[in-house]
Amino acid sequence: MKVKDVMHKGVDWVSPDTPVIELAKLMQAHDIGCIPIGEEDRLIGMVTDRDIVCKGLANKTFNAARATARDVMTTGIHCCREDDDLTKAVHHMETLKVRRLPVINKSKRMVGMVSLGDVGQFAPVDLLSGCVKGVSAHH
């Protein structure tokens, strides 16, 4: 099974200048836990609901009214390719201890997102079990 067979297709990204409050509203409206951040046609980061809490709200100097995606995003994003075997992507998620991976095509354009939930719906039980254990392990 390939990543393209299980991923969420057509994921959009937002600018690093997008207000954090808007990010939270987008997450709520679309029932999602992360939003890719792009600039000049390149994926430059990701913001998760956890980033907003841990890098933002938990910080005494954080100003939610002024904060942008750039203030809370995680950079150095790892991806997988749409033609990768799902097993390869799952092992990548385990190693990185991440619940989501952006998916790129041969032209290095983001075409989707694969999540732990996607793995749960489509992967064999043994692969799913290993992924959940790896991703859930304490950092």
Which residues are covered by each model-predicted region?
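Tandem CBS (Bateman) regulatory domains
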Residues: 1-10, 48-79, 85-94, 113-139
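The conserved cystathionine-beta-synthase
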Residues: 13-31, 79-97, 104-105, 123
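A glycine-centered beta-loop-beta connector
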Residues: 27-30, 35-50, 93, 101-117
